[in-house]
Amino acid sequence: MSKTAGVGRLGGARAADAAQQQQLAAGDAAVARAARPIETLLRAAPLVLCVAAMTLMLRDQQSNEYGTVAYSDLGGFKYLVYANGLCAAYSLASAFYTAVPRPATVSRSWVVFLLDQVFTYLILAAGAAAAELLYLAYNGDKEVTWSEACGVFGSFCRQARISVAITFGAVLCFILLSLLSSYRLFSAYEAPPPSALGSKGVEIAAYPR
């Protein structure tokens, strides 16, 4: 009788654990459904910012008695245009991807995480390069006898400054997306159990001293 009772208690505990896991899964699914519109809007926000920054930079040109200057004359500004275009396309694609309900898997979470990282660093590098160009345009560089240019081409510099500021707004959005995708990836999926590593476990190389 005691053995039968023990088996019954074990079966009841397993059933309770299974029910608890189902409740947790249902709760996670409800949270995911509620958070999907918010994440979709967050992923669409860089699209607006990147298109605005790219448009301003593409139209940035000034002519006066000293000559003509355009964004295409400076490599850093051209890089900013290309980076904003690529990030705008990714923002649109990721917003559509997030808006469509689909089961979350480890592989999909990894893909989204890696793409978020790549485009975050891409737009950050573009903003930093353009900001450095603006600094030189406003202040010059006495060590290499570069004079400042914004005193002559003030309108060009002001429009470029607005474009760079909007780009850093997009950078902030991509940083938030990177944090979100990394949290989803590393909190929802646990490390593989020791049995999945094989009978030998993890082998660590030993180097001679």
From Swiss-Prot:
Pfam families, A to Z: CASP_dom
Keywords: Cell membrane, Membrane, Transmembrane, Transmembrane helix
Membrane spanning stretches: 38-58, 80-100, 110-130, 162-182
Residue ranges that the UniProt entry lists as topological domain Extracellular: 59-79, 131-161
Cytoplasmic face of the membrane: 1-37, 101-109, 183-209
Membrane topology according to the record: Multi-pass membrane protein
UniProt record similarity statement: Belongs to the Casparian strip membrane proteins (CASP) family.
Name this protein carries in UniProt: CASP-like protein 2A2
Organism: Zea mays
